[in-house]
Amino acid sequence: MLSLRPPFVLLALALLSPTSHSAEPSGRKVRDVVIYANPLFHSAFPSVVQRPDGELLVAFRRAPNRLALSEGHNNHVDPNSYIMGVRSRDGGVTWTPTPELIYAHPFGGSQDPGLLQLRDGTLLCTSYGWTFVRPDGVPKLKAPVLENYPGSIFNGGYYLRSTDGGKQWSAPLYPPHIDAEILLTPYGKPIPAYNRGALTEGKDGRIFWVVAACDSIQPSKISTHLLISSDHGLSWQYSCPVAGDAKVSFNETSVYETPRGDIIAFLRSEKYEDQACMARSIDGGKSFQPWQGMGFQGHPLHALRLPDNRVLLTYGYRHKPLGIRARILNAECTDFATAPEIVLRDDGGTSDLGYPWSVVLDAHHVLVTYYFNVPGGLQHVAGTILEIR
């Protein structure tokens, strides 16, 4: 998280494509779809939910395509990046042609929206942001701050709530600062907790959110921690550390509750050869067992419960051949080391792709959303419909 193409209308064409390249019998690729593409914008980092009436809502981060302005490249940090949304009423095949604005932060630079739909229909949308400071101001900021690109200062996390299906959103709500975090905002205040990744609502109604914290700037080191809400996301309490290490950093974590009640954090790693990692709690989130590598590369991960309680684990693959991959795990996620890999996409153009987020469509189909680019193309929001066997 901290390391961090075609007319102007939505391209929502359903492209029939071959079945998965893997021999895995449990999942078969049906088709790829374009969810949102526009040559004026770099569109990325989607999340998706299905509303009670079957409507799909995808939130994503959109920023101006700097290449169209004759600049040398696009960044993942931009003063004009906003949270946008599109909707589908036909199972993800076609999407609303004009995206709706979910939120534009007053200080700019909104990132990676993470949607969670609660059982009562309430929507949460997490994000984090960057504030852009002119060169004469940066040296005068109270330290320590995190500067990504020149002048872009990390501002921490926030989230939005909606009780009407995303038609209207609350003003930003700010999670608590956690003690492990050393960074300050550009205004000299403690950083609010932040993360890019899926939250989950547990069987008892509590919401689990694994957030990141910068423990050290030199050398850079990031750990993860669990926050819990018992009031539908109105407030949060710190629970415990999730994963930390003297050399390896962890961030961009999605959290999942198994039928048995284990809480599993699926972790992106840094300085660990891009290996997917996980940590497990067997006491309801009071503590976590030591983190472990999962034996394969890819990031970040998203876990989705299937109708039969198996788990679809999806992840971006930024190694050749570039694309999107998945595994179907057992209900308790104990067979990650042996579950066959499913290749959803292997036609990526550059490594600026991935970040999948999935949703169940019906008893036998799933939509996997992600951002993608093909050779010579611009980043756009896409998806793959997968048949589950």
Predicted regions, residues:
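N-terminal secretory signal peptides that target proteins for export/translocation
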Residues: 1-3
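Asp-box/BNR beta-propeller blade signature and adjacent active/binding-site loops
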Residues: 23-389
